[in-house]
Amino acid sequence: MAQPLDFLLVSICLFHSLFSFQVEDYYAPTIESLIRNPETEDGACVFPFLYRSEIFYDCVNFNLKHKWCSLNKTYQGYWKYCALSDYAPCAFPFWYRHMIYWDCTEDGEVFGKKWCSLTPNYNKDQVWKYCIE
């Protein structure tokens, strides 16, 4: 009884090692990739950027303690940790519902915190962030 189970476990491990692969840009940047891929383009964050087939308009954190951004329009392994000055700026003016806003607003926010759109048309893109007061 133990031999078939051992064979099954060994087969599963072998199958997994042969047919699984890692796509480098599928995973979040690691400290090793930061060392291997130094900052370029003066270390400026590029927004929006494409990562894992998704578009991001601000700094993100995937499996990392701190937020990071891509240094290319399409993530190519070049990235950096975000400082306060790196976060995406509000897009003023922006269109929300039937109004144009030139400043942060509390409209539509349940908790009464001011927010802004990260694109000129919130109705279409629906990407936003809370404003720093």
Swiss-Prot record:
Disulfide bonding pattern of the chain: 45-69, 59-82, 90-116, 104-131
Tissue: Expressed only in the epididymis.
Keyword terms, alphabetized: Disulfide bond, Fertilization, Glycoprotein, Repeat, Secreted, Signal
GO cellular component: cell surface; extracellular space
Biological process (GO), any one: single fertilization
Any one GO molecular-function label of the UniProt entry: heparin binding
CDD domains: FN2
Domain (Fibronectin type-II) ranges: 40-84, 85-133
Positions bearing carbohydrate: 72
Localization in the cell: Secreted
InterPro entries with a match to the protein in the record: FN_type2_dom (IPR000562), FN_type2_sf (IPR036943), Kringle-like (IPR013806), Seminal_plasma_PDC-109-like (IPR016356), SP_Capacitation_Regulator (IPR051666)
Endpoints of the signal sequence: 1-20
Family: Belongs to the seminal plasma protein family.
Function according to Swiss-Prot or TrEMBL: Binds sperm in vitro and promotes sperm capacitation. Specifically promotes capacitation induced by high density lipoproteins (HDLs). Also binds heparin, phospholipid liposomes, and weakly to gelatin. Does not bind chondroitin sulfate B.
PANTHER family for the chain: BINDER OF SPERM PROTEIN HOMOLOG 1 (PTHR22918:SF4), SEMINAL PLASMA PROTEIN (PTHR22918)
Name of the molecule in the record: Binder of sperm protein homolog 1
Organism whose genome encodes this protein: Mus musculus (Mouse)
Upper lineage: Eukaryota, Metazoa, Chordata, Craniata, Vertebrata
Encoding gene per record: Bsph1
